UniProtKB/Swiss-Prot annotation:
The lineage of its organism: Bacteria, Bacillati, Mycoplasmatota, Mycoplasmoidales, Metamycoplasmataceae. This protein is one of the early assembly proteins of the 50S ribosomal subunit, although it is not seen to bind rRNA by itself. It is important during the early stages of 50S assembly. It holds the Pfam family Ribosomal_L13. This is Large ribosomal subunit protein uL13. Disulfide bonds: none annotated.
Amino acid sequence: MRQTTIIRHKETDKKWFVVDAEGQVLGRLASVVASYLRGKNKPTFTPNVDMGDNIIVINADKVVLTAKKEDDKIYYSSSGYNGGLKAINARDLRAKKPFALVEKAVKGMIPHTKLGRKQFGNLYVYAGREHNHEAQKPEVLEVK
């Protein structure tokens, strides 16, 4: 009788990938990135172990939003105090923090737990083409 193989954190093989977000639809890009951050692309996926890869997203300022979401999509944040609710649309958020659109989309697609926060820490988003992770020799990840 076979038993399920349990993978430990030490046995995981983490790789580095770089994704070019230029011309990519935000949600489709975020779902692929979230899947790789969790490690769901690996045949030995274990939900309670951080076995995801490190992902570098470049050109995050050139990601595409479909339909009228550029003006209609609202991002909310709260200070926690009465009257402390702030709202900003996607166009203004892109102008203020170009990397935040991709970060918020990916963050919503990974678990909201301690492990999810650790996996989210393996995401590096840059607005331009330049990044400082060349020493890790990242492989190019094509998003269809």
